[in-house]
């Protein structure tokens, strides 16, 4: 991808695999090594990644207001499928949607906006994105626009940092289009995927740091029916104990995850 840095005016990026604006916000809790999605996937890591390619991303510089350091990130894609195209080519809206999301049809524009505020040891960030779903193949069971969002808060005091984050992902698909017995995948299933993470990290000294992270990922079908078949919510719990040691140019990092 290509980036244009404009000094005090910020940075504009475009191309493939830019990371979009969401990479600054998803799973953003203190960790000694890696996010909990490094060993397995969770919905928080997916939030906003449909804007990773075919998009224009703007990152503002930091500016101070009443002692608070603020920054903003904005992104726009005319074809928000997260799939890149070669020089002189374009992605096909129909086949790209099938490949990326498994639902057929097409989709349109995508928008994303994030903001970060820092005050002394406290950092707060929030991001949200929306993507148009336009699927003419579903007839009466029309889809609606998808929404994905995440927020986090971190606080550092001396060698100790704590953090908490929540994410929300609604693909906008209709429950009638997904069989009850079908495995519920992110962006292929109706309902809502939500996640919450909390962590604590400790810098033992300038070379050694450790952290503990707990993540709970929940799928809610949103059927909420008094009759017929109710699809039970499913929750995935994961924990990670991490350690990192560095000495000069050498570093050793490891984690144990369940």
Sequence positions of predicted segments:
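Outer-membrane beta-barrel proteins
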Residues: 1-258
């Amino acid at each position: 991808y290509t980036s244009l840095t404009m000094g005090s005016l910020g940075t504009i990026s475009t191309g493939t695999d830019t990371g979009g604006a969401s990479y600054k916000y998803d799973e953003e809790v203190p960790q000694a090594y890696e996010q909990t999605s490094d060993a397995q996937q969770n919905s928080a890591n997916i939030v906003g990644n449909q804007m990773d390619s075919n998009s224009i991303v703007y990152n503002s510089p930091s500016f101070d207001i009443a002692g608070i350091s603020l920054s903003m990130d904005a992104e726009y894609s005319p074809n928000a499928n997260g799939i890149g195209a070669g020089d002189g080519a374009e992605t096909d809206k129909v086949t790209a949607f099938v490949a990326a999301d498994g639902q057929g049809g097409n989709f349109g524009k995508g928008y994303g906006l994030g903001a970060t505020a820092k005050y002394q040891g406290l950092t707060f960030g929030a991001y949200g994105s929306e993507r148009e779903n336009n699927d003419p193949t579903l007839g009466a069971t029309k889809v609606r626009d998808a929404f994905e969002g995440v927020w986090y808060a971190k606080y550092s005091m001396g060698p100790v940092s704590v953090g908490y984050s929540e994410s929300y992902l609604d693909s906008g698909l209709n429950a009638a289009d997904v069989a009850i017995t079908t495995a519920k995948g992110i962006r292929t299933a109706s309902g809502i995927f939500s996640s919450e993470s909390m962590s604590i990290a400790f810098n033992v000294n300038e070379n050694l740091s450790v952290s503990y992270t707990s993540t709970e990922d929940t799928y809610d079908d949103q059927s909420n029916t008094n009759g017929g078949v109710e699809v039970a919510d499913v929750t995935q719990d994961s924990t990670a104990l991490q350690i990192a040691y560095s000495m000069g140019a050498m570093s050793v990092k490891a984690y144990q995850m369940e």
